[in-house]
Curated annotation (Swiss-Prot):
This is Active breakpoint cluster region-related protein. Disruption phenotype: Mutant mice show impaired spatial and object recognition memory with reduced maintenance of long-term potentiation (LTP) in Schaffer collateral-CA1 pyramidal neuron synapses. InterPro entries: Abr/Bcr (IPR037769), ABR_PH (IPR037865), C2_dom (IPR000008), C2_domain_sf (IPR035892), DBL_dom_sf (IPR035899), DH_dom (IPR000219), GDS_CDC24_CS (IPR001331), PH-like_dom_sf (IPR011993). The central Dbl homology (DH) domain functions as a guanine nucleotide exchange factor (GEF) that modulates the GTPases CDC42, RHOA and RAC1. Promotes the conversion of CDC42, RHOA and RAC1 from the GDP-bound to the GTP-bound form. The C-terminus is a Rho-GAP domain which stimulates GTP hydrolysis by RAC1, RAC2 and CDC42. The protein has a unique structure having two opposing regulatory activities toward small GTP-binding proteins. Interacts with DLG4.
Length: 859
């Protein structure tokens, strides 16, 4: 590449530009979790904005004369309010003018591609078709949609640039453009098939060959050339090129946009969506991403890469895994001193010709995966939340950068440990000539992506081979440049201007699915990202023997900094010979999978938002509604006092003439009868519509309650019990005693803590105390079945702690900056309070009242 100068800009391919501009964030990690400090290499320069338009507009040519403005390789921070705002806004106009010119050319290219489509379709139904309808739809797949998206974008942006002033806003246009990248995902997935189909049709049909070799592209308005001839293959590549260009422009726009400008948050969001999309698309579409040649002399390309946890010698190691066209390579980033070029160290590789996936029977014979203790994972999460709050406080108080960096380092260490120790879903691969390897993933979606990518490549005519030490060194050396995933997926690697994600509760109704070719037993699971990785949150019932399942099931999913929702559709396996005994080994067949971004503007509206996810020809319809954490923290008393939900516990017990509310006794009895061995009891969401039905029956004191309970899904019954405690107008352990519980659990001296915590129980009103002790003994019995139901005392404390303790007056916590801060400060303590009582020897109501050892003073 020629050196940069102030006289002009070097011409770069989009992929070179991508590497130059997209190496953000710390790449400094070690597989064992040690962070390394690294400075920029001496003499390094930042890369200016590059536009590769075939014809540069006069406006764009003008800005290339100076070349003094550059884009930092780190994420753009934007201009401080009022700092050179005029210059920044003028630069915005220059960037937009150049982008608009290239957008015009891109639209002309799409038009040229669409031009032959109509006549080809017209001949498809005649006796002498050039192409079949199927071939036409494959070759021109999504081109019309992409054209319409960009034409609308261009038509809206053009007048804003032409009638420029400092008040012009266009961030919403870029945000909308980014939100439509799903169309590009569909195009990219089909790209290879489209090229192969076009090539085959050219070979078999001279007429189509003539058309595809000379498509006329209209020149821009200011250009002397009216038309240029371009091949169909070259034009089909343009949409892929365009996504990267748009992302680079967003960086430039953010750099030259004041942070207090209304466009700034919209451009940030557009950039986040674009970057997520870029990291997810399959990079084998670019033939220039070549490492070395395969044994057959073909180019070896990188298809997929990412960070996975490997079980190596009974310990977990974070690896960077690279899937090439004919080999899977597992590597670790070497430790290097500051300023040195980083390199990968190859741990092992398997030629795809030798790679096999073990059968369920073979997997059973493999050593079982022992999950990390849940309470330790929860401790990590609460530490991370607390550190996030401390960092925000330091920033708000304009604290020292060293203190903030120390906190960030601690947060990275905890997030790294969580990422390393939380995955439990096994992904086993085997080299037919020797060793087996085991990765652990947190998401079945991710496992499916890796498996499908490998199996797709294995359909080709692959040969077995052994790499020489030199060949292995060359291949490993290429990984640093070729990688598409640069950073470990932890939130501490995020930039300050990136969206923190959503905190609260997402209500999702999975309505139905269609597009299945034959009847099957079908169900869906829902995954959301949390703390940087995806976890499964809910599962619909199995709809049997159908091609059009109608679930209409509602779920409440807790979000912790979440940005995406995934839906996976499975065919249920009832063949017992194929069922794996490993609880984490899902052997049901994935029929389709899809993902959507949780756009805060769309999700945070109070109304239900209905959408459709397309996956492998299958369409799943769902609706969602989001409740922010600050809203979900509020307890709302019931307006009517005849029911049980939202009514004071003392009122209910007095009306029923009972010591423990009937709803609590019946739900606990049913759980102990048939749900105490249910995996994830109280943790897994019940169907929301079932829970609402039970709520209505209990509120109406319907005589059919017992019959309905016996027929209802056990997770719905567990969910009803949780909902009852959550909707109490004041928490079971009362608002009055809440501060004292927080102080008591923080005491260091065991004897003082014992006296204080027991005294607080004695201070509770009798209905509250008796109900609490009744629930406490039940939860202990549930935890006794932990080897089967996977619910430890800590798990149960995490589920019930906030429900039993969370105060009704959240507004009193005005000193805390956000709902997320409230959560991170208080939840840890709420969980610890309940855990203290769960771990305590049995507490008798009579002995507690009789015992005079505890303090008798009022709280």
């Amino acid at each position: 590449m020629e050196p940069l100068s102030h006289r002009g800009l070097p011409r770069l391919s989009w992929i070179d530009t991508l590497y130059s501009n997209f190496s953000y964030g710390a790449e400094d990690y070690d597989a064992e979790g040690h962070e390394e400090q690294k400075g920029p290499p001496e003499g390094s320069e930042t890369m200016p904005y590059i536009d590769e338009s075939p014809t540069m507009s006069p406006q764009l040519s003008a800005r290339s004369q100076g070349g003094g403005d550059s884009v930092s390789p780190t994420p753009p921070e934007g201009l401080a309010p009022g700092v050179e705002a005029g210059k920044g806004l003028e630069m915005r106009k220059l960037v937009l003018s150049g982008f608009l010119a290239s957008e015009e050319i891109y639209i002309n290219q799409l038009e040229a591609l669409l031009l032959p489509m109509k006549p080809l379709k017209a001949t498809a139904t005649t006796s002498q078709p050039v192409l079949t309808i199927q071939q036409i739809e494959t070759i021109f797949y999504k081109i019309q949609d992409i054209y319409e998206i960009h034409k609308e974008f261009y038509d809206n942006l053009c007048p804003k640039v032409q009638q420029w002033d400092s008040q012009v806003t266009m961030g919403h246009l870029f945000q909308k453009l980014a939100s439509q990248l799903g169309v590009y995902k569909a195009f990219v997935d089909n790209y290879k098939v489209a090229l192969e189909t076009a090539e085959k049709c050219s070979q078999s049909n001279n007429q189509f060959q003539k058309i595809s070799e000379e498509l006329k592209v209209k020149g821009p308005k200011d250009s002397k050339d009216s038309h240029t001839s371009v091949t169909m293959e070259a034009l089909l590549y343009k949409p892929i090129d365009r996504v990267t260009r748009s992302t680079l422009v967003l960086h430039d726009l953010l750099k030259h946009t004041p942070v207090d400008h209304p466009d700034y948050p919209l451009l940030q969001d557009a950039l986040r969506i674009s970057q997520n999309f870029l990291s997810s698309i399959n990079e084998d579409i670019d033939p220039r991403r070549t490492a070395v040649t395969t044994p057959k002399g073909e180019t070896r390309q990188l298809v997929k890469d990412g960070f996975l946890v490997e079980m190596s010698e009974s310990s977990r190691k974070l690896r960077h895994v690279f899937l090439f066209t004919d080999v899977l390579l597992c590597a670790k980033l070497k430790k290097t001193s500051a300023g040195k070029h980083q390199q990968y160290d190859c741990k092992w590789y398997i030629p795809l010709a030798d790679l096999v996936f073990p059968s369920p029977e073979e997997s059973e014979a493999s050593p079982q995966v022992h999950p990390f203790p849940d309470h330790e994972l929860e401790d990590m999460k609460t530490k991370i939340s607390a550190l996030k709050s401390e960092i925000q406080k330091e920033k708000a108080n304009k604290g020292q950068s060293r203190a903030i960096e120390r906190l960030k380092k601690k947060m990275f260490e905890n997030e790294f440990l969580l990422l390393l120790n939380s995955p439990t879903i096994p992904f086993r691969i085997h080299n037919r000539n020797g060793k087996s390897y085991l990765f652990l993933l947190s998401s079945d979606y991710e496992r499916s992506e890796w498996r499908e990518a490998i199996q797709k490549l294995q359909k080709k005519d692959l040969q077995a081979f052994v790499l020489s030490s030199v060949e292995l060194q060359v291949l490993t050396g290429s990984c640093f440049k070729l990688r598409t995933v640069h950073n470990i997926p932890v939130t501490s690697n995020k930039d300050d201007d990136e969206s923190p994600g959503l905190y609260g509760f997402l209500h999702v109704i999975v309505h139905s699915a269609k597009g299945f070719k034959q009847s099957a037993n079908l169900y869906c699971t829902l995954e959301v990202d949390s703390f940087g990785y995806f976890v499964s949150k809910a599962k619909t019932r199995v709809f049997r023997d159908t091609t059009e399942p109608k679930w209409d099931e509602e779920f409440e999913i807790e979000l912790e900094g979440s940005q995406s929702l995934r839906i996976l559709c499975y065919e249920k396996c009832y063949d017992k010979t194929k069922v794996n005994k490993d609880n984490n080994e899902i052997v049901d067949k994935i029929m389709g999978k899809g993902q959507i971004q949780l756009d805060p503007q769309t999700v945070e509206s109070k109304n239900w938002h209905t959408d459709v996810i397309e996956m492998n020809g299958i369409k799943v319809e769902f609706s969602m509604k989001f409740t922010s954490r600050d809203m979900s923290l509020k307890r709302t008393p019931s307006k009517k006092q005849t029911g049980v939900f939202g009514v004071k516990i003392s009122v209910v017990t007095k009306r029923e003439r009972s010591k423990v509310p009937y709803i609590v006794r019946q739900c606990i009895e049913e759980v102990e009868k048939r749900g105490i061995e249910e995996v994830g009891i109280y943790r897994i969401s019940g169907v929301a519509t079932d829970i609402q039905a039970l709520k209505a029956v209990f509120d109406a004191n319907n005589k059919d309650i017992l019959l309905m309970l016996s027929d209802m899904d056990i997770n719905a019954i567990a969910g009803t019990l949780k909902l009852y405690f959550r909707e109490l107008p004041e928490p079971l352990l009362t608002d009055r005693l809440y501060p004292a519980f927080m102080e008591g659990i923080a005491l260091s001296d065991p004897a003082a803590k014992e006296n204080c915590m027991m005294h607080l129980l004695r201070s509770l009103p009798d209905p509250n105390l008796i109900t609490f002790l009744f629930l406490l003994e039940h939860l202990k019995r549930v935890a006794e079945k932990e080897p089967i139901n996977k619910m430890s005392l800590h798990n149960l404390a995490t589920v019930f702690g906030p429900t039993l303790l969370r105060p009704s007056e959240v507004e009193s916590k005005a000193h805390l900056t956000s709902a997320a801060d409230i959560w991170s400060h208080d939840v840890m303590a709420q969980v610890q309070v309940l855990l203290y009582y769960l771990q305590h020897p049995p507490i008798s109501f009579a002995e507690l009242k009789r015992n005079t050892l505890y303090f008798s003073t009022d709280v």
